[in-house]
C-alpha cells in the first residue's frame, strides 16, 4: 500500500527516519521523501491502515504535525491559484496550511515572492481567493487570484513542470510574450506550478517588426526548394566546361579559330607550340627562337613573307618563323595539326633518329656545328633555312620538292614558289619546276638522295659555318658560300634524285630530316598558305588534309574551310581567356541560346536594400547563395526553383538585369 505523508520537512527528514517510524506497523517496502511530503510503501494493507491511524497528527518535529493518509491519485482537474507578493519569511507549509482551511490543497509551491496553490475543487478555490486576497501574511499583503493559465488537467500533466493548456491573458493575444513577460507583466503567466522549474509558454516566433531590414536568408522561401536543384542538377555548371565547352572551346583553335588565332601572337601560343610538338621539334624550335640572327632576319622579312617572298630573307624567316607573328600564330592555330604532329614523332622521330644519327651527314652535321659556330648552329638546328645560305638553299630545294610532294594542286604552286625565290634560286628554277613532275621517281632514289645529302653537302656543310657568321647578310652569304656548290648539287641531284617528293616523307635526308621535318610538316600547313600568292593560297587551302606530306598532319577542318569561313575566322575577335565565371558558350552562331539557363545561374532578383545583411549568407553553405558574398564559389549558383525567375527568363536577361542594379554594386563577372 502507498501511504501519503504530508507536512514533512524534506530538508532535515531522511527516508531512513521515516522507515523507522513506520516499521512497527508492518513491512516497509520503500520510502521516498520529497520537498514537503513523502511516500511510504508498505506490504500489508492492515499494517498500512494501522500506521495511518497511529501516525496521523504525529509531530515528527516540534510544531509539525504529520498528515498521514492513504495515497490517492491526483484529481483530474485542479484549480491553480496565483499568490503574489509573498513574504520571504513565509514558508510553503505555512501557506499550504492557510489554504487548507478552505479546502483540500493538492500542491503548494513557493517561488521567490510568489506562489502557486493547486486546490481540488473550484468552489474551494474561489472561496479561498475571496477570503485571502489582500490578507496580510508575515508582514506583506498577498495578492490571491485564479491563475490565468487555467486549471490543470489530468494526473500525468500535473507531474510536469508546466501547464500546456493555460489560456493566455487577454492583453497578450496579439504578441504572446516569451515565457510570460507580456505587455502587462503577469507572474502567473511567467511561472507555472512546477517545483522550481519556471513554467513558461513555448517560445513563439518573433514577430516581423523590422521586415525590411532583415536578411534575405530569412525572407527566402523554404530552403527545401533550393536543396532539390543542388542534387537534381549536379552537372549544370560543373560538367559544362568539359561537356558543352569541350568541343566548342578546346577543338576551336584548329577548326574555327585557326585563322583567327593567327592574328594575335601570344607568348602562351609560343609556349604551347613549344610544348606540343615532338622531342625532335622542341629543342630545334626553341633554339631557333633563341637565335638572334634568325630572329632578326625573321622580323625583317615578315612583310615579304606574306607577299612575294625574296628567297634569302624568306627562308631566314622560314627558319625564324617562330618569331614571325603570322607563322607563329599559325603554329598556335593548328591545335589539331600540332596534336597530330605529336602523333607523328613515331614516324618523324624515327626518321630523324635513324637518318640523322646514323648517316655520315649526321656526323658532318654535328661536327659542322661544333667546328665553327656551335652556338649559332645549335640555335639554327630547327631554323634550317635561317642557318645559312647552303642550308637555306637546301631548305628551299626541299621546300619546292616538298611542295611538289602533296598533290597536283600544290605542284602547281611550285611554279610561283620557284618564281618567288628567284632572287637567290635563280640558278635552279628549272630544276625546281621540273622537280614535281618526277615525284614518282623519288621513291626509287633513297640511296642517291642519302648520298647526295652526305657527299655533296658534307663539303658545303664544312664550308657553311664559315659563311654562317654572315647570317644577317643572307643574300651575300647565299652567293658567296654555297651558290656554286649547292646550286650545282641541286641542279644535278635535285632533278634526278631530288625530284621525287613521295619518297621524301618515307626516306628522310640524313641532314635535313630532323630540322626540316620538325619545322615543316605542322608549320607548312599555315606558313605556306601565308607565303603563297592569293590564288596559290586558295588552292593550297582547298587541298585535302593529307596532301602535304602523306601523313595528314594539317587539320582537315582548317584546310577544308572555305575562303569565306577563313575570312570570317580572321575577322573573329581574339577569344578571351575563359574562367569559371565566363557565361557558358556552346557555339558562336547563337550566343543567346542558353539565356534562360544563364539567367537562372547569374540573374539575381535581389535589390540592393536586401543585400545589407548579405554576410549572413555564409550560414548556409550550399543551398542558398544568391547575392555575392566573399569567394568566387558564390557565383556557381545552381538554377533555383524561384517563382520570380519566370519574369526574368527572357533572352537578354543577363544584360538587362544588370541595368536595374545599383551603380555601386559590382557584379564582379
Curated annotation (Swiss-Prot):
Query: Where are the residues of the annotated region TRBP-interacting domain?
Result: 307-354
Stretches for region Disordered:
148-175, 193-232, 566-590
Q: What is its main location?
A: nucleus
Residues annotated as carrying Phosphoserine in the record are 161, 220, 242, 244, 256, 272, 280, 520, 523, 527, 562, 582, 618, 620, 623, 627, 643, 649
* Keyword annotations: Acetylation, Cytoplasm, Immunity, Innate immunity, Isopeptide bond, Nucleus, Phosphoprotein, Repeat, RNA-binding, Transcription, Transcription regulation, Ubl conjugation
PROSITE patterns named in the record: RRM
InterPro entries in UniProt: Nucleotide-bd_a/b_plait_sf, RBD_domain_sf, RBM14_RRM1, RBM14_RRM2, RRM_dom, SRSF
The name this protein carries in UniProt is RNA-binding protein 14
Amino acid at each position: 500500500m502507498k501511504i501519503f505523508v504530508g507536512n514533512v520537512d524534506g530538508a532535515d527528514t531522511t527516508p531512513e527516519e521515516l522507515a523507522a517510524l513506520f516499521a512497527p506497523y508492518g513491512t516497509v517496502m520503500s520510502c521516498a521523501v520529497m520537498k514537503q511530503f513523502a511516500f511510504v510503501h508498505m506490504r500489508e494493507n492492515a499494517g498500512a491502515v494501522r500506521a495511518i491511524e497511529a501516525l496521523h497528527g504525529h509531530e515528527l518535529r516540534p510544531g509539525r504535525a504529520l498528515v498521514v493518509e492513504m495515497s490517492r491519485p491526483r484529481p483530474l482537474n485542479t484549480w491553480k491559484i496565483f499568490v503574489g507578493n509573498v513574504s520571504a519569511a513565509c514558508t510553503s507549509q505555512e501557506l499550504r496550511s492557510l489554504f487548507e482551511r478552505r479546502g483540500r490543497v493538492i500542491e503548494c509551491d513557493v517561488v521567490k515572492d510568489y506562489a502557486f496553490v493547486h486546490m481540488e475543487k473550484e468552489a474551494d478555490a474561489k472561496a479561498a481567493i475571496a477570503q485571502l486576497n489582500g490578507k496580510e501574511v508575515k508582514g506583506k499583503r498577498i495578492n490571491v487570484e485564479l491563475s490565468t493559465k487555467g486549471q490543470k488537467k489530468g494526473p500525468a500533466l500535473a507531474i510536469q513542470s508546466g501547464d500546456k493548456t493555460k489560456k493566455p491573458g487577454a492583453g497578450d493575444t496579439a504578441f504572446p510574450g516569451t515565457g510570460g513577460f507580456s505587455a502587462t507583466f503577469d507572474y502567473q503567466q511567467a511561472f507555472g506550478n512546477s517545483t522550481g522549474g519556471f513554467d513558461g509558454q513555448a517560445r513563439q516566433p518573433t514577430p516581423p517588426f523590422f521586415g525590411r531590414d532583415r536578411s534575405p536568408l530569412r525572407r527566402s522561401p523554404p530552403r527545401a526548394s533550393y536543396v532539390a536543384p543542388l542534387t537534381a542538377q549536379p552537372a549544370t555548371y560543373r560538367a559544362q566546361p568539359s561537356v558543352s565547352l569541350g568541343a566548342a572551346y578546346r577543338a576551336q583553335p584548329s577548326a574555327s579559330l585557326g585563322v583567327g588565332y593567327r592574328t594575335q601572337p601570344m607568348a602562351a601560343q609560343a609556349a604551347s607550340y613549344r610544348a606540343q610538338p615532338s622531342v625532335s621539334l622542341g629543342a630545334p624550335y626553341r633554339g631557333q627562337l633563341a637565335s638572334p640572327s634568325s630572329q632578326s632576319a625573321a622580323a625583317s622579312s615578315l612583310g615579304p613573307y606574306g607577299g612575294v617572298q625574296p628567297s634569302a630573307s624568306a627562308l631566314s624567316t622560314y627558319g625564324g618563323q617562330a618569331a614571325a607573328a603570322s607563322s607563329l600564330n599559325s603554329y598556335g592555330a593548328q591545335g589539331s595539326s600540332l596534336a597530330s604532329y605529336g602523333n607523328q614523332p613515331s614516324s618523324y622521330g624515327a626518321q630523324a633518329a635513324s637518318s640523322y644519327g646514323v648517316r655520315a651527314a649526321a656526323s658532318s652535321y654535328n661536327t659542322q656545328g661544333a667546328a665553327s659556330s656551335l652556338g649559332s648552329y645549335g640555335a639554327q638546328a630547327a631554323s634550317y633555312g635561317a642557318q645559312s645560305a647552303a642550308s637555306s638553299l637546301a631548305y628551299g630545294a626541299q621546300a619546292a620538292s616538298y611542295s611538289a610532294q602533296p598533290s597536283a594542286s600544290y605542284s602547281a604552286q611550285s611554279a610561283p614558289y620557284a618564281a618567288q625565290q628567284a632572287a637567290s634560286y635563280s640558278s635552279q628554277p628549272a630544276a625546281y619546276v621540273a622537280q614535281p613532275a618526277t615525284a614518282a621517281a623519288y621513291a626509287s632514289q633513297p640511296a642517291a638522295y642519302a648520298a647526295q645529302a652526305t657527299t655533296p653537302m658534307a663539303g658545303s656543310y664544312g664550308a657553311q659555318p664559315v659563311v654562317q657568321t654572315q647570317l644577317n647578310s643572307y643574300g651575300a652569304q647565299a652567293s658567296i658560300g654555297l651558290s656554286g656548290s649547292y646550286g650545282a648539287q641541286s641542279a644535278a641531284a635535285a632533278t634526278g634524285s631530288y625530284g621525287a617528293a613521295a619518297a621524301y616523307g618515307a626516306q628522310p635526308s640524313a641532314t635535313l630530316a630532323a630540322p626540316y621535318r620538325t619545322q615543316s610538316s605542322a608549320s607548312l600547313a599555315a606558313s605556306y598558305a601565308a607565303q603563297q600568292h592569293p590564288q596559290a593560297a586558295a588552292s593550297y587551302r582547298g587541298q585535302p588534309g593529307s596532301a602535304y606530306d602523306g601523313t595528314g598532319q594539317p587539320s582537315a577542318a582548317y584546310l577544308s574551310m572555305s575562303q569565306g569561313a577563313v575570312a570570317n575566322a580572321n575577322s573573329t575577335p581574339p577569344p578571351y581567356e575563359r574562367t569559371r565565371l565566363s557565361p557558358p558558350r556552346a557555339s558562336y552562331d547563337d550566343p543567346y541560346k542558353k539565356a534562360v539557363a544563364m539567367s537562372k545561374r547569374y540573374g539575381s532578383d535581389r535589390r540592393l536594400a536586401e543585400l545589407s545583411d548579405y554576410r549572413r549568407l555564409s550560414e548556409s553553405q550550399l543551398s542558398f547563395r544568391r547575392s555575392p558574398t566573399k569567394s568566387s564559389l558564390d557565383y556557381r549558383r545552381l538554377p533555383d526553383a524561384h517563382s520570380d525567375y519566370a519574369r526574368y527568363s527572357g533572352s537578354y536577361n543577363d544584360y538587362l538585369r544588370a541595368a536595374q542594379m545599383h551603380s555601386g554594386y559590382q557584379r564582379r563577372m
